[in-house]
Amino acid sequence: MKTPWEFLQYSRNKIKNTWKIAFVSAFVIGLLIHLPVMLSDIPNHDGLSSMYFDQNMITSGRWFLTVACGFSSYFTIPWVIGLIGMLWLSLASVVLTETMELEDPLTIIGVSGLLVSFPALASTFAYVFTMDGYMMALFLAVLSVLFTKKYKKGWILGGVCLAFSMGIYQAYLPFAILLCVYVILLFFMEEHGVKEKVQYTLRYLGMGIAGAVLYYVILQILLKLQGKVLDTYQGINSMEQGGSGQGLLTTLKGMYYDFLAFTLHGDVLVNNIFSFAACAVLLLSVVFLLVRRMFQRKWWKNPAFFVIIILLAVGLPLLTNVILIISPNLTYHLLMRYQWVLYLILMLGFTDRYAGENGKADIGIRWAALLAAWILVFNYGVSDNIGYSNLEKKYEKTYAYCVRLLDRIEQTPGYYQG
C-alpha cells in the first residue's frame, strides 16, 4: 500500500498533460473573470430567501440538488460556493478536452476560456446559492458523454451520470445532447461501415433513454416517500402530463423562434462588432474545412451526406431548446442557455482537428480560429463584469431606498416597534 505522498506522486504521473492544462486554465481564467462576484455578497430576489436553504427542490424535479449543494453548507457563502463551482467547471473542461480529443495546448486553453467566460455562468453566479450544485450537474452531463464514447457498455454509467445531472438541474440536458451529436458526427466522418455507425449511434440513444428513465423513476419514488407532487413552477409538472398541452406545431414554432431570436438578437452570443467578427471567423473556418473534406472524401456523391446536413439544420434548434418541449411557457433565464457556448467550443475543436492537412492555409485558419476564440473570451469576460457591476449598483440603490423608506415609516405619528 502506498503512502499518501507516494499515491499523490503516482497519480500525478498518470494525469495527462492535456488534463492539467484544461483544469488549470479553466480554474485560473474563471477566477480572473468571476473573482469580483465571489468576493461580494449581492443577493437577488431569490437570494434574500435563500440565505439558508437546504435546496430540497424535489417538487421541481431536482431530487439531487440538496446533496450537490451540501458540500458548501446550506448557507449562502459566495467565496466557498464559487470555489467549489469552479472546481466542478474545471473538471468539466477536462472531460470536454478528453471527449473532443484535443491535444493542442492553446486550443485547450481557448476551450476552457470559452467555457468559464460565457455569460450564462455569470447569470448562474447571480443565483450563487445553487451555483456549485449546478456546475456539478454540468460536469455530470459532460461526463455521461465521455463514458458512452470511451467504453462499449459505458452508456450504462453514462445514463447514471445523466440521471443525476438532471436530478440536480434539468437545463443541462441540451448540453449533453449537443455534445453527443458532435461526437457521433465525427464518428460518421471517419471510415466506418453502416452497421458500426448504427451501433455507435444506438449507444448514445441508449444512454439518453436510460438516463431519462432512471431520473424519472427516482423522482417518483422520492415524491412518494416525501408525500409531495411536482410543482407548477416553470411548467415542471408537465413531465407527468406528457407535455405542455399546446399543439405540437405551436411548440415547434416557438422553439425555432426562440433559437433564432436568442442567437441573432439576444445580445449574448454576439453583442458587438468584435464578437460578431469572431463568431463569423469560427463559422467560416468550419464551413471551409467541411466543404474541403466533402470534396476530398467525395461525400457529395452520397445522398446520405445531404440528408444528414438537412437533419442537422432542422434538428439542432430543436435539440438546443429541447427543454421547451416539456415546458414551452417557462421563463427562459440566461443561466438555462449554457448550451449555446458549445457551438463556439465545438467549432474551435473542429478547426483544431481538421486544419492540419494543407500547410500554410491551415496554419492561417488555426491562427484565425484561436484569435477569434480569445476575442470572445475577453469580450464575454468584460460582459460578465458589466453585469456584476450592474448587480451591485442595483442592490445598493435598492438598499438605500429601503433605508429611506424605513426612516420615513418610523417618523410617522403613532408608529411604534411591535
Where are these regions (language model features)?
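Hydrophobic, aromatic-rich transmembrane alpha-helices
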Residues: 92-93, 268-303
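Membrane-interface micro-motifs in multi-pass membrane enzymes
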Residues: 58, 62, 85-88, 106-149, ...
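Membrane-lumen/periplasm interface segments of specific transmembrane helices
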Residues: 201-281
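Membrane-interface transmembrane helices that cradle and orient dolichyl/undecaprenyl
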Residues: 141-155, 187-194
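Signature aromatic-anchored transmembrane alpha helix within multi-pass, membrane-resident enzymes
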Residues: 156, 353-384
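Perimembrane helix-loop-helix junctions
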Residues: 175-209
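Membrane-embedded, lumen/periplasm-facing catalytic core of multi-pass transferases
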Residues: 376-418
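Membrane-interface alpha helices of multi-pass inner-membrane proteins
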Residues: 154-170, 175, 181
